[in-house]
Curated annotation (Swiss-Prot):
Catalytic activity of the protein: succinate + ATP + CoA = succinyl-CoA + ADP + phosphate; GTP + succinate + CoA = succinyl-CoA + GDP + phosphate
The protein's name: Succinate--CoA ligase [ADP-forming] subunit beta
Pathway this chain belongs to: Carbohydrate metabolism; tricarboxylic acid cycle; succinate from succinyl-CoA (ligase route): step 1/1
NCBIfam families assigned to the protein according to its UniProt record, in alphabetical order: PRK00696.1, sucCoAbeta
Amino acid sequence: MKLHEYQGKEVLRDFGVNVQDGKVATTPEEVQAIYKEYGQPVVVKAQVHVGGRGKAGGVKYSANEDKALENAKNILGMDIKGLTVNKVLVTKAVDIDAGTEYYVGMIVDRNVQSYTLMASAEGGMEIEEVAATNPEKIIRHRVDPVTGLRPYEAREVAIKAGFRGNLNKIADMMVKMSKAALERDAVLVEINPLFVDADGTPIALDTKFEIDDNAMYRHKDLAHYRELSAEHPLEVEASDYGFAYVKLDDGNVGVLGNGAGIVMTTLDVVNRAGAKPANFLDIGGGAKADVVYNAVKLVSKDPDVKAIFINIFGGITRADEVAKGVIRALDEGILTKPVRMRIAGTAEDEAKALLNEKNSDLIKMYPTMFEAANEAAKEANALGGK
């Protein structure tokens, strides 16, 4: 479960992290009232569960009351990557030039089968950009989930990352952040920027906090944070179906497979083919025709999807059940986008016979996933994909 910035700050504050105060508003008039209360320049920040809010115009500095009101009117109700902004966080503006911005974060790192603490002196930037252009500027440190991050480890990481200021206070914030991540079963926690003021005091100006959905039964006190209206509607619908589904930004090829490993590999081959996957969708093992039908229906609803790549290796999943689900979606007029399939394994021959008998121009099968990915990418790009 993703938390809004203000919610993530509330969780971190409970663990003793020094976070920037702010107030939530749902109307321009409320923003105006908050500005009057603060009596100084503010920043109006869209609260949506996607990255790139600033680039999309969802974060605005407001030097005066009129500007705060204008920015609130522009941001509230705007669409950011398919999500409508229904609320904003209003914070006091900080003079960034009077201090230094850093980045710290904790992720579940499957490569080391543990948590990894990340720190960088390149704060205020998207960490993905830093990882792509200057990966050496990100310091990584494995955190033992039993002992947690110890103060001396945090200080060592801060020094290696080139942090300046009161290193004991910075290390203390990192320790408290890691404790929040561990105790709240987070898969991701970020403080970006971690602002160190002229006195060397660290302040969390912006945060990301995401809790493992499978652990939410342990955190029922946070269940009220979930807002279906703030989540992507396709992800909400997928949850109703019981699918493992993630909407991906800027994609043009819908991806459907059986098993997380196959789906992850499929994302890679789509990228290699010159397109971008629009989603992650795992139908699971043993999926029947109705499950496949619902999965195809879900992916077809995404306007970003220009072509669909179905990658199936049948074990307990029968390929003919997959074919029946696809054919049903076609017969009902739900499937209107090109489908490129690689289908193999249990009942492969039966599946191919069903699809060949249907003889639809929309559906084509290929012997390898690389060929299918290349054809799906060609179709998507030719049809105006991103």
